[in-house]
Amino acid sequence: METVVIVAIGVLATIFLASFAALVVVCRQRYCRTKNLLTNYNNKPTVDLIGAMETQSEPSDLELDDVVITNPHIEAILEDEDWIEDASGLVSHCIAILKICHTLTEKLVAMTMGSGAKMKSPSSLSDIIIVAKRISPRVDDVVRSMYPPLDPKLLDARTTALLLSVSHLVLVTKNACHLTGGMDWIDQSLSAAEDHLAVLREAALATEPERPMTGADNFLQEQSAI
């Protein structure tokens, strides 16, 4: 049964990699003056990214290495902090959140592989698979929201949904694999993502129209001035 969850989380990691690649292709074409880092990459449409996850719902005996597709350019992309010209400065925070979620996913795969014999029950494995399948559409939603024109409210809502889904995956994986000690790095990663999310939320709030002052507000303001 542990093979099922390894395959499921492995496919999730594939979705992250493919989504990053799709995002870079679009943004390079629209913004960047430098040559495309993904010249040799076979770009899949977003619909295919979601569909690929759905086709993996049945158990399989494939090994993790047979599922995870590694793009030779992805590491260079993730390390490049200036690969996109973004006047708002919000896209870099979205990418940082995607990076954190991608790293968490890879490490969850490793933990699952090392904890196969400690799985509680088939229902625990089923929980992990269900939660993992919910994350891939969230990733695609974030990528879509990063296309211009940028909407800070949409960025905030979709990155929040993604982070909540990843946090849920962390919880069910910890529970299913009996993971307790030495998990500080997970909390630190989620905290770092929350910091980036706070910037997006602040930008979203800044776009809110100012609320007209009511009579009660005027009264309180006058009282405070006395």
UniProtKB/Swiss-Prot annotation:
Ranges in the topological domain labelled Cytoplasmic: 1-3
One biological process term in Gene Ontology: negative regulation of oligodendrocyte differentiation
Organism domain of life: Eukaryota
GO CC, any one term: extracellular region
Keyword annotations: Cell membrane, Endoplasmic reticulum, Membrane, Secreted, Transmembrane, Transmembrane helix
Subcellular location per the Swiss-Prot or TrEMBL entry: Endoplasmic reticulum membrane; Cell membrane; Secreted; Secreted, Extracellular exosome
Residues in the Extracellular compartment per record: 25-226
UniProt main location, coarse: endoplasmic reticulum
Membrane topology classification: Single-pass type II membrane protein
TM region positions: 4-24
Matches recorded under InterPro entries: TMEM98
Keyword field contains Endoplasmic reticulum: yes
UniProt record similarity statement: Belongs to the TMEM98 family.
Protein name: Transmembrane protein 98
Organism classification: Eukaryota, Metazoa, Chordata, Craniata, Vertebrata
